[in-house]
Amino acid sequence: MATPMVSSAGGLLAMLNEPHPVLKLHALSNLNNLVDQFWPEISTSVPIIESLYEDEEFDLHQRQLAALLVSKVFYYLGELNDSLSYALGAGPLFDVSEDSDYVHTLLAKAIDEYASLRSKAVESNEMVDIDPRLEAIVERMLGKCISDGKYQQAMGIAIECRRLDKLEEAIIKSDNVQGTLSYCINVSHSFVNRREYRHEVLSLLVKVYQKLPSPDYLSICQCLMFLDEPQGVASILEKLLRSENKDDALLALQIAFDLVENEHQAFLLSVRDRLPAPKTRAVEATQAVETTIAPNENPSGDVQMADETPAQTIVHETDPVDATYAERLTKIKGILSGETSIQLTLQFLYSHNKSDLLILKTIKQSVEMRNSVCHSATIYANAIMHAGTTVDTFLRENLDWLSRATNWAKFSATAGLGVIHRGHLQQGRSLMAPYLPQGGAGGGGSPYSEGGALYALGLIHANHGEGIKQFLRDSLRSTNVEVIQHGACLGLGLSALGTADEEIYDDVKSVLYTDSAVAGEAAGISMGLLLVGTATEKASEMLAYAHETQHEKIIRGLALGIALTVYGREEGADTLIEQMTRDQDPIIRYGGMYALALAYSGTANNKAIRQLLHFAVSDVSDDVRRTAVLALGFVLYSDPEQTPRIVSLLSESYNPHVRYGAALAVGISCAGTGLSEAISLLEPLTSDVVDFVRQGALIAMAMVMVQISEASDSRVGVFRRQLEKIILDKHEDTMSKMGAILASGILDAGGRNVTIRLLSKTKHDKVTAVIGLAVFSQFWYWYPLIYFISLAFSPTAFIGLNYDLKVPKFEFMSHAKPSLFEYPKPTTVPTANTAVKLPTAVLSTSVKAKARAKKEAEQKAIAEKTSGPEKPVNESGSGKGKASTEKEGDSMQVDSPAAVEKKAPEPEPAFEILVNPARVVPAQEKYIKLLDDSRYVPVKLAPSGFVLLKDLREHEPEVLSLTDAPTSTASPATGTAAAAQGTPASAMAVDDEPQPPQAFEYAS
């Protein structure tokens, strides 16, 4: 008999008023099954059903059934709070495993409610009553996820609900614990907003990692770095270094390189100093050797060099185990101090330099001599274009032109050498010697070039200043000239970045208190650089002085300095940010925008974004509005795709300052990504009606397009041509021209071998890079700060290293067309008149003579029966002849079609074999593959950066790469040739420091 169709719930609802409990139970059971269909009708009787739930004489099961029914009715009515409240009353009848919209919606609501209560309890430090029934539902849900094998879902809920016990359970029970832990680290960086809670999660992960039979030490050390626990890292490194297994030592060296990539100088030095020295007898030997080498010690040499020599003597004096440890310790200390990676980067950038001097020549010729802004911009562009390559050919060839720089332009020109020679730690002092203050204050040279030289020393030793700090302090103390103080303050801030050195702080503070506008501005920035991320009490001292002084320059320097002190502190900086953003002085509010940007840098924190957007549209000062928009770039660089979307409306603002801020925000957060949306947003701004907006858009576009080839995005070629047009246009305004010149430098930065990277591969902020871009963005007020962009440059290189930290030759594959990632063609920027002069008249007699000579040469070659390999040389020679006289007589044209036919059918290969060390741009990383029969295997799979290699055929002799180095004896002419062709100048071991180029001075 078929079940009759129910057309109304009226009868069942009437039964609810019956006195007998069995009838009520029957009605509730059936209504529960029909509620999806008849909830509008049932909703009229909700008070009756509620009274049944509240009736304590009623059976528990029946009360729970009533609660479930009411919950479903409220769900359909859209009253989710009431629905959840009754669902909790339904107890086990609310089945978390049921696959229905009702259950999914209420579970989400329950988890949100529970998570917000747990967060509130922790953040307010107060007891918050949490309904045990709510907790029970969440726990049932977590248990179900774990039992169903949905570990990632369980971990997400556990992290959100601050249930670290359940998080640990989910990780341990998962089938791939290592993978689950990696996922968890990513989640904690991406989704955990509060810093303290993120630390709790990472501490738990370290605990779980350490319980594993074979811990992933690379990940553990990254977590410990986030937690700022140098002792933990030092213990792991010591354990690996003392291991008898060579692979463990390689792993320790790889960990050290990975930590160095995050650029946290104070942490790295702390780890280095905690690594225990070898046994006592070895230490005594060390001291003896140190006393003998002391007289020969180079005053500019880094402190670490003193540790390296004695380590070699220890090897012979201790037992083999300790000797091995001592040798490995020397290597790892060199890495942690940053020397090894800086040295290798310097050699890579020198040997692979592909900068195009023709571009600079074009800029120089098109810039009017009277225009000092464009003259300086050309010097900046040259420094950026050759950052870290040690190639100063352009300056040597144009000394007369360079000598036209006066006053602050001379300061900038000298400081530019610091960018070109960045990382030349051992020869930094000797390179800058001709310009440095001689014999105390006012040694006879120009104070501008002396100040610039001190700033240059800071740029050379940025974030690695152990060997130069004392010299800079002495220079600062021994002068009262504000220009020299300006350079010395910036140099000290750079070299002691983030070390919070009290003595240096006091020296800089005494300069600040002289109340000199020029020196005070640099002192304010320097204090910030020194105290980066310390969130120190000294910030309030700086703020108090900013209120006292009358100089805008000093207030601006201090405002930025205060912002730097709260770098990465997130909600810990909220009080200071509140204080600054409410200040009456617009310059301090401007500093407040930077404080917001840096405190929440790379977090994509909604609260910070909301505040910045609010100031961007509501502040009365254009400076503050511009900076508020620009600051979005810093908050969002970990999620660059978001930035163009968030600032797209602001980029169309009526206010040019807001448009400029939007351009630079995109430039900062999307730097080096070549993101299509970013380029589309910037394109209209490069032809804006306001000159400074065009300038900002051109610079931002270059930042986005750095290391992007024309083959991967045709707009890169269009942009290069646009820059050339602006530079060559006599009627273009100075602001745009300056933007175009700087953009040309950024586009080809570091000899076309560096990109701008704000995150390391382990998703840690690169402190130096973020700080560099923050100070660089101040160039609006002070052009010499442009050089800070060099701190954000990161080499696009794969540098494989063996156990001895040498660079062996080994091949690997880039599984993509070579044209996608090749260097730009060197002829991209022809000189203005070349195209017109190319067609030249050629006499027919000379054509015939050449043809005759060619024929004779070929016959002679056949007669001598030359060997096979020489034939292509002759062919290529004849090809050259054809190319150079392309439009000559008939006899030459006979060869042409054949040559064209030969070349035409060659298809481009689908892959490319690269040789270590190789240029690998970020977009190329996903195509990097190792060859199957390779002699070397990386300790960790990494497509770029410094990678330690395990040698599978140790008995075979090794061939080493990266032996090109600058020579000190090369004349300017040979230097030019070597730079243009990238030919090796002299062979040297990888451990040797490249020689400094010839010293030169330009007349004032």
Curated annotation (Swiss-Prot):
- Carrying Phosphoserine, the residues are 896
A cellular component term (GO) from this record?
endoplasmic reticulum
In this chain, where does the modification N-acetylalanine occur?
Answer: 2
Matching Pfam families, A to Z? HEAT_2, PC_rep, RPN2_C, RPN2_N
**Glycyl lysine isopeptide (Lys-Gly) (interchain with G-Cter in ubiquitin) cross-link position in this chain?**
166
Swiss-Prot/TrEMBL GO biological process terms:
regulation of protein catabolic process
Low complexity bias (residue ranges)? 965-987
Each PC repeat occupies one of these ranges, namely 412-447, 452-485, 487-521, 522-555, 557-590, 591-626, 627-659, 661-695, 696-736, 739-771
Molecular function as annotated in GO? enzyme regulator activity
Q: Which domain of life is it from?
A: Eukaryota
For this UniProt record, give its keywords in alphabetical order, as a comma-separated list. Answer: Acetylation, Isopeptide bond, Phosphoprotein, Proteasome, Repeat, Ubl conjugation
What residue spans carry the region label Disordered? 858-905, 959-1004
Q: Report where it is expressed, by tissue.
A: Ubiquitous with highest expression in flowers.
Q: Which InterPro entries match?
A: 26S_Psome_Rpn2 (IPR016642), ARM-like (IPR011989), ARM-type_fold (IPR016024), Proteasome/cyclosome_rpt (IPR002015), PSMD1_RPN2_N (IPR048570), RPN2_C (IPR040623)
- Which proteins does it associate with, and in what oligomeric form? Component of the 19S regulatory particle (RP/PA700) base subcomplex of the 26S proteasome. The 26S proteasome is composed of a core protease (CP), known as the 20S proteasome, capped at one or both ends by the 19S regulatory particle (RP/PA700). The RP/PA700 complex is composed of at least 17 different subunits in two subcomplexes, the base and the lid, which form the portions proximal and distal to the 20S proteolytic core, respectively.
Question: What does it do?
Answer: Acts as a regulatory subunit of the 26 proteasome which is involved in the ATP-dependent degradation of ubiquitinated proteins.
Family named by the database record = Belongs to the proteasome subunit S1 family.
PANTHER family in UniProt: 26S PROTEASOME NON-ATPASE REGULATORY SUBUNIT, 26S PROTEASOME NON-ATPASE REGULATORY SUBUNIT 1
Q: What is this protein called?
A: 26S proteasome non-ATPase regulatory subunit 1 homolog A
Q: Which organism is it from?
A: Arabidopsis thaliana
The upper taxonomy is: Eukaryota, Viridiplantae, Streptophyta, Embryophyta, Tracheophyta
